[in-house]
Structure formats: structure tokens, C-alpha cells
């Protein structure tokens, strides 16, 4: 076999294998984007909601006058930070880009609440937490039941008990705030 025949053979083999290589490369790029639009939307919405809970939890620790509200805020910051970390890993594994900043809607909620303080903050924050957790439970239950991706469904299912616990705690804390009608500071810190 002459050099020119050998070169032609190599060129032909390379040319024939190029489409296969490109197809495999394209398939590997799209494998992470095979996430359904509803699963992707759930991840993004859950991430925004989680960031909101963390920000409002920090605000509650600073602005609330009732120690139970401060404690609730601390719990929200801790639990939602943990859930956010888990969600970030799933998003990264699935090729979903998450914003590191709150969107306008959630930023507006933070801005509105942080203008309040004391008993007024306590009442509004707890009202919002009850409402927010009811909505979160519906969304997470829907994802757990109807989600397409096993990892996203698992995250939703595993997070649901914590959200339900948060709702119960939010309702009891809101009742305490309503019934006290004023702040109840303890003398121990």
C-alpha cells in the first residue's frame, strides 16, 4: 500500500467516524437537559423560595420582638440553607442554572417585610410564613407525585415532612403572636 493510499484510507475512516463522534458529543450535552420543563421549573422555583426563607429568617432574628418568632427565623435559616445546598447539587447534576440572587417578586417580599419591626414585623412575618409554607407543601407534593426525574422527585418527597413541620410551627407561632398582642421577650438569651 502506497503512502498516498494509506493517507486516503485514514482520511476516509476519520471522515466517516466524525458524524458518530459529533452525535455522541451532542448526546452527552443534551443528557443533562433531558429534565422536563416542569422539573426544571420546580428546581428554580424551589431555589428562589429557599433563598427567600433564609433571607427572611435572618431578618426575623434581627427585627422580631417575640423570641418565638426569632427562634422560628433561626430554624428557617438553618433548615432552608441545608435544603438549598442539596438543591444546588441536584441542579448542577441536572444542568439547571440557578440564580444566586432573589428574583423581583421575592426581593419585593424581603423589602416589604424588612421595613417593619417589632410586633408589626412578628405578625406579618408569621402570616407570610403560614401562607408560604401552605403553598410550598402543595408544590412539593405535586412534584413528589407527578415529577418526571427520580432525583428531583426524591428531593421533593424528602423535603415535604420538614415543610409540614415548618407549617405547624408557623401556625402555632402565629397563634402565639396573635394571642399575645404584644412582644414576649424572655429574660434569658
Residue ranges and their predicted role:
Residues 2-189:
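His/Met- and acidic-residue-enriched segments that coordinate or traffic transition-metal cofactors
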Amino acid at each position: 500500500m502506497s503512502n498516498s493510499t494509506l493517507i486516503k484510507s485514514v482520511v476516509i475512516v476519520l471522515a466517516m467516524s466524525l458524524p458518530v463522534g459529533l452525535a455522541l458529543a451532542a448526546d452527552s450535552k443534551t443528557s443533562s437537559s433531558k429534565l422536563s420543563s416542569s422539573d426544571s421549573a420546580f428546581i428554580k422555583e424551589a431555589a428562589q423560595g429557599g433563598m427567600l426563607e433564609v433571607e427572611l429568617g435572618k431578618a426575623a432574628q434581627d427585627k422580631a420582638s417575640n423570641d418565638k418568632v426569632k427562634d422560628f427565623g433561626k430554624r428557617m435559616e438553618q433548615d432552608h440553607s441545608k435544603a438549598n445546598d442539596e438543591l444546588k447539587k441536584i441542579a448542577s447534576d441536572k444542568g439547571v442554572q440557578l440564580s444566586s440572587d432573589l428574583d423581583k417578586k421575592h426581593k419585593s417580599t424581603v423589602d416589604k417585610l424588612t421595613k417593619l419591626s417589632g410586633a408589626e414585623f412578628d405578625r406579618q412575618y408569621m402570616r407570610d410564613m403560614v401562607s408560604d409554607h401552605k403553598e410550598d407543601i402543595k408544590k412539593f407534593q405535586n412534584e413528589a407525585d407527578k415529577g418526571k426525574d427520580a432525583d428531583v422527585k426524591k428531593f421533593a418527597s424528602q423535603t415535604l415532612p420538614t415543610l409540614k413541620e415548618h407549617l405547624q410551627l408557623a401556625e402555632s407561632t402565629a397563634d402565639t403572636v396573635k394571642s399575645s398582642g404584644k412582644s414576649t421577650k424572655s429574660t434569658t438569651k
